[in-house]
Amino acid sequence: MASDGNGAAAVAALGISGGGGDDWAPPLRRNLPLLAPHEVKLAKLLLSEGQSHLFEHWPEPGVDDDKKRNFFDQVCRLNSSYPGGLASYIQNARKLLADSKAGKNPYDGFSPSVPSGEVLTFGDDNFVSLEEAGVKEARHAAFVLVAGGLGERLGYKGIKVALPRETTTGKCFLQHYIESILALQEASCKLVEGECNTKIPFVIMTSDDTNALTVKLLESNSYFGMEPSQVHILKQEKVACLADNDARLALDPNDKYKIQTKPHGHGDVHALLYSSGLLEQWKSTGRKWVLFFQDTNGLLFNAIPSALGVSATKGYNVNSLAVPRKAKEAIGGITKLTHVDGRTMVINVEYNQLDPLLRATGHPDGDANCETGYSPYPGNINQLILEIGPYMEELQKTHGAISEFVNPKYTDSTKTAFKSSTRLECMMQDYPKTLPPSAKVGFTVMDAWLAYAPVKNNPEDAAKVPKGNPYHSATSGEMAIYRANSLILRKAGAQIADPVIDTFNGQEVEVWPRITWIPRWGLIFKDVKAKVHSNSSVSQRSALVINGKNITIQGLSLDGTLIVNAKDEAKFNVTGHIENKGWTIQHVDHKDTSEKEEIRIRGFKFNKVEQLELNY
């Protein structure tokens, strides 16, 4: 145990004037001799920010000393992982909690208007030329996947990127993303005269929940064909929980030597990229673009070539990918906000804030559909393309800190106490909030059938979605892939049968022919059009799997299941009438524990009765 002399010296080291050490957490004062100089500094930081309650229960030195040191290890992590440190976090929390209690509207003083952007029509000349421009730019790009979440909300215990994107091939989301990036890399390099050794960098942001499982998925599958040196894993830390309106940090209910923590949100990706040093490395090797995307949208790479083409041709510093949005649909709208003081920004405004904001600023109908049948404020799908130079300049100023929000659940209308601890949160798409008015911020809209089919709702929640609204479930996500591929082949001239309507897990969906292909086969529409000829047809009950880059379809009449595998550059033309019993669709109840989770959450599986498999 420390002597009084040591205790006095330690109190002096804390820099607490006026002999106030005895008033400020005496249990901490008694334990100061245990602490290293950097831990004493952290203790001082906590006391100066009103956190003396964290030490009230500390026993005499000699009791739980290892736990006390572990406490400061955690504080050190929390301090180093937040831009500006823990003091900034607590100060930001106090301000945001005070605003929340006062009912302050973050959009006070702002008027909304429709921002400028590009609306694309799949398959027209403009779309085709933008896709080609995007492929050309791809070798100057880096991709960033935010994948910090588990699939619990879906009714799946694993990491979301390990879920099958579709069950015809069983390929998971992460495999599809990597194969798509590699296809872009190959196609982009082919456009360069001479040798091109470009390897497109791929960053995955993980969390404590997903990190080990993500690494295992990559390593056990040889990185799905990507070179391990191309892949960078950045793990986000959690942030401290807040117990009350004074931003007193909450202790873990199960461990009084641990601060309770929760995820901060995917906005952390910007601070992680800033501190990683990767951006400087990328810029020095000629990278121009950083593309951000989320973990379970199976259609997103359909949108990337044309959207990257828009960024390059329009010179956008920030390009948000978007889809047409019905008024009041539960998806954020991309909006230009102009403040009374002249400030402007183009950002995502959540759907439940957009309607009242419009009504409060002279739009009596609020968020209403215009003559197109859609809201003029396009739906944000959380895919961003940032120009690397301006992005790095902004991060030099902010160190990656993103505008935060807090969402406490109060016990009653006085807003004095919380039902449970809260924390600050931030979102990747709020990056533009701090940009100067001179920044070129735009958007690219394309049809939802082509670009957006997120998997985020479990079967019970999806079944409650009002009819006509998107389910955003594993069921709808898989069926959307078949729909998109069928419509793309139709646009290329093939005769693809109409879908039938069926219900799985209480969700009514269109069931199109089960058509899938590897990204190398049909990266952009021009590729598909060159390989599919108009005298081919596929029946509704059919499945067609194309595993090969140089497979052409000419004069094919398919009624059943056909799988075509061609190695590397092998060329093969699929033709003739092919009929077999095929694969039937079998309904599965989401409560049927005899089936795997990834099947149960879809509500169907394939009964592989008969197929023709061709190998070249």
UniProtKB/Swiss-Prot annotation:
Its EC number is 2.7.7.64. The gene is USP. It catalyses: a monosaccharide 1-phosphate + UTP + H(+) = a UDP-monosaccharide + diphosphate. It comes from the Eukaryota. This is UDP-sugar pyrophosphorylase. CDD domains: UGGPase. InterPro entries: Nucleotide-diphossugar_trans, UDP-sugar_pyrophosphorylase, UDPGP_fam. Pfam families: UDPGP. Keywords: Nucleotidyltransferase, Transferase. Its cofactor is Mg(2+); Mn(2+).
